[in-house]
Design a protein with these regions (language model features):
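Conserved class I S-adenosyl-L-methionine
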Residues: 139-170, 176, 180
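Active-site micro-motifs of SAM-dependent methyltransferase domains
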Residues: 99, 116, 145
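A short SAM/SAH-binding and catalytic strip from SAM-dependent methyltransferases
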Residues: 108-119
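Substrate-binding/catalytic lobe of Class I Rossmann-like enzymes that use SAM or dcSAM, i.e.
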Residues: 165-244, 248
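A short glycine-rich, Lys/Arg-flanked "PGG" loop and its adjoining helix->strand segment in the class I
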Residues: 122-134
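Conserved N-terminal segment of class I S-adenosyl-L-methionine
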Residues: 1-47, 51-104, 108, 232, ...
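Short catalytic/ligand-binding loop motif for oxyanion handling, primarily in non-cytosolic enzymes
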Residues: 56-57, 118, 146-151
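Short conserved AdoMet
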Residues: 85, 119, 133
Length: 273
């Protein structure tokens, strides 16, 4: 079994044990996609690579794409189909996003929170580019190497043990107790005044962002981080290399945006000639 297949199966255990619907709020969805907005999506063909249980697609349909397709290697596609039941012009496809090649490229291709879990994140990015039509937009989000020292040195070693255990053990005996201190830390950061001293604390911006959510979401995020067999923390320099080394990309349109102090949003357009 390939490592990406193991990862897909691990995440299916995560996604398939959530309540029906999207685990994300409207504000979280819009934050992940900025600088893209509804006007960029409306009436366009849109592809999500690594759709999980369809949590992002549930929000994406509200932006009224002409056609929306999600691809995922795991059995979470079953839950995605349930969450998207009754929506018109929506399709969920079970397949390897790295190998996926659409007969017709899409106007918009996005990959949120998936590339960093692949055996080869760069090959995943190549699929994003390959499936975007000339003049179309691509948009990705990945964990950053920058700003994640606490995660890399404390959480990631735990992941190497937890990821080989049964999902329920990882969720309830690892993710739950591990996330309690960070839950309290994030809620405290939200209450404290926004002064320069506190802004130097670990994961400060991320703590303020996630503090808007309930404990169950904290645990979902922790479980996601612990259940996967592999996680890469990608430096900005690597993303710059991905973007600048591909002649298909219109270099005048590219962007790399730090999100919450510990992740990167990046994207651009495919050149028309």
């Amino acid at each position: 079994m390939g490592s990406d297949t193991k990862t897909a199966e691990a995440f299916a255990n995560s996604w398939n044990n959530l309540p029906e619907g999207s685990v994300y709020t409207k504000d979280q969805f819009e934050d992940w996609f900025a600088p893209l907005t509804r006007k960029d999506i409306e009436g366009k063909s849109v592809l999500e690579l690594g759709c999980g249980n369809g949590s992002l697609m549930v929000h994406m349909v509200i932006w009224k794409p002409e056609y929306l397709e999600g691809v995922d290697l795991g059995d979470s596609v079953v839950t995605a189909e349930i969450n998207l039941a009754g929506r018109e012009n929506v399709q969920v496809t079970k397949g390897d996003l790295v190998e996926f090649t659409s007969p017709e490229p899409f106007d918009i291709v996005y990959c949120i929170g998936v590339l960093h879990h692949l055996q080869s994140p760069e090959k995943g990015f190549e699929s994003v580019i390959r499936n975007t039509k000339a003049g179309g937009n691509f948009h990705c989000w990945v964990y950053a190497r920058e700003g994640n020292a606490v995660i890399r040195y404390i959480v990631d070693p735990v992941r190497k043990v937890a990821s080989v255990l049964p999902w329920w053990m990882t969720k309830y005996f690892f993710a739950t107790p591990l996330v309690v201190p960070f839950y309290l830390y994030a809620k405290l950061m939200k209450l404290l005044p926004k002064i320069a001293l506190f802004k130097k604390l670990p994961l400060y911006e991320y703590a303020l962002w996630i503090a808007e959510r309930e404990f169950a979401f904290f645990r979902h995020v922790a479980f996601d981080q612990l259940v996967t067999p592999q996680t890469a923390y990608i430096p900005k320099a690597t993303i710059e290399q991905w973007l600048t080394s591909r002649k298909e990309i219109d270099q005048k349109t590219t962007y790399i945006i730090m999100r919450n102090g510990n992740s990167w949003k990046f994207g651009g357009k495919i050149a028309t000639s």
